[in-house]
Amino acid sequence: PTLGWHMARTSEPVPLDLQMRFYQGLYVEQVAMDQIGPGQRMPADKNLACERTIQTLACNLDQMIIQPAFNVDGVVIRPDAISSHGRELKEIKSAKSLKDDYVLDLVINKSAAEHNGVPIESSTLMLVNPEHRCGDENPKMVEIDLTNEVDKLSETYDIADEIAMLRQPEPPAPVLTRDCRKCPFLSECFEESDDLIIHIPRLTERKFSPFLGNDIMYMADIELDVPLFNTLTA
């Protein structure tokens, strides 16, 4: 949450590699849409798209809605596709393997839809098929059913609360994790950030967790707990 709060207030030029990934994503999205089949694309205008999405879903026709839009407290969320009849969400990624962030994307989309009174029964991720070769019969995209994973995570996720957190004037209290090592806002969250235990070489999650459990965040404090200190060389 703390990283999201800072990112929401950061504006930097988009580097060339990310621009290329964006265009790559557009191409893969079109390939996926061709494989899904015909559907009704919502307007580019986000406000009009929100209105049309709800109207189209209310018709309960057996068709795919492309780029639907859901308004949550003034923030518009646009999933890649949703079936108006089966209430299936589809998320398209220009990648070959599953990542945790992709599950979260589906959770956000599901939460936005259900915030607007649209129940979601299943969640599907579409990835580039690594087995596809030009001219063969393998599909260009593969589908992964993530319904169970998305439903479980959705039990503790509230999109309205997340949006409210991003809008609050002060950042949420930071929680130290091993991933903080690569965060550009580390020094803004923690004093003496260079002395944090996350900088210990080859520190595994198994060794890291007991330190936090004993409120030890800085290397200068490690020697105060001899048993934990000894685990670093075990």
Predicted region positions:
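Nucleic-acid nuclease catalytic cores
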Residues: C50-M64, F70-D161
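Helix-hairpin-helix
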Residues: D195-T233
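Cysteine-cluster motifs in flexible loop/terminal segments that predominantly coordinate metals
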Residues: P1-L3, R167-L196
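Short, charged/polar micro-motifs that form catalytic or ligand-binding hotspots
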Residues: L18, F22, A95-V103, A173
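Active-site catalytic microenvironments for nucleophilic, acid-base chemistry
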Residues: A112-N116, E188, N214
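Solvent-exposed beta-edge/loop recognition patches
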Residues: I159, L166-R167
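Metal-dependent nuclease catalytic cores that hydrolyze phosphodiester bonds in DNA/RNA
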Residues: P1-R87, R206-I222
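Short His/Asp/Glu-rich catalytic/ion-coordination signatures at enzyme active sites or charged loops
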Residues: R133-N148, F185-L203
